[in-house]
Amino acid sequence: MDPESLRIFCSVASELSVTQAAARLGRAPSSVTTRIQQLEADIGAELFVRTNKRMALTAAGERFLEYAQRLLALADEARHVVTGGREGGTLRVGSMESTAASRLPALLAAYHARYPATRLALSTGPSRPLIEQVRTGLLDCAFVALPPAFGGAAALEELGLASRAAWREELCLLLPASEAQARRAADVATRSLAAFPQGGTHRGIAEDLLGVAGSTQWRVQEMSSYHTMIACVAAGACVTLLPASVLALSDAPASLKTLPAGPIDTVLVWRAGFDVPAFQHLLAQLGAAAS
């Protein structure tokens, strides 16, 4: 069960295709198939179901995937610790879409300029999945917003995670021009909310403010970008909630109505004890950006 076999397995699990995984890895498909078969023989269980040229993880494969990803993460962490970060390596950073758009470009550009040997691998998603990915070792750290009912730093500590406040964001409801007379969330007449898929803190706050949960009048349109959400609002078809810092970056029409929705902190979370140089450099860069 060598690291290369684990990397091949994780790639095939991600692509669910030997051909695509082989292209991604720069290997021949036959060699990828052989390594997967050897890994299955070593473990003593089938990791994939193969039917009609399609692949899917078996129950054993799904369980093994989490461990394989964690083992690879630990190997990378050990390499960082032993070399003192001299060889660069990879720091896997997760982020909400809003933070990636409004806060990270300057921070990560400054980091790269100072530590060019370290590769920053950025992925985005809702806060809850990001927290889980940090907990299980799929990510080294992540910028998230904690839901009001989450329990704050104490709840993170129970998960074995540490945290540090990064930025305070002012949230706002963005409404169509037809909502010009609205003064509070209860006045909103448009009954369609544009939001990211479930698991995002901002979506939960919007649903609470607007009384979406349990309502037969409201519907939620799931979208993949703030640009699409803003366009939907401009078309008069929905409302959305977003940080004011993101709205400031957009070309939203001045005719759209905004209502303040309160502040929320963006925090950086990581596994307690995670102390590789590349991450310490990120903490230092974050501190420098805040000062």
Where in the sequence are the language-model features?
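Hydrophobic hinge/microswitch elements
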Residues: P126-I131, R135-L139, A145, G199-S255
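Secondary-structure junction motif
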Residues: A185, A189-A213, V276-Q280
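A short LG(V/I)-centered, amphipathic sequence patch enriched
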Residues: E40-L57
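A late-sequence structural motif
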Residues: S255-S291
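Short helix-boundary/capping micro-motifs
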Residues: C10-A28
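Short beta-strand->loop
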Residues: E158-R168, A244, D251-D265
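Central regulatory/effector-binding core of bacterial HTH transcription factors
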Residues: G88-G151
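Alpha-helical linker/hinge and terminal dimerization helices associated
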Residues: D42-I43, F64-G85
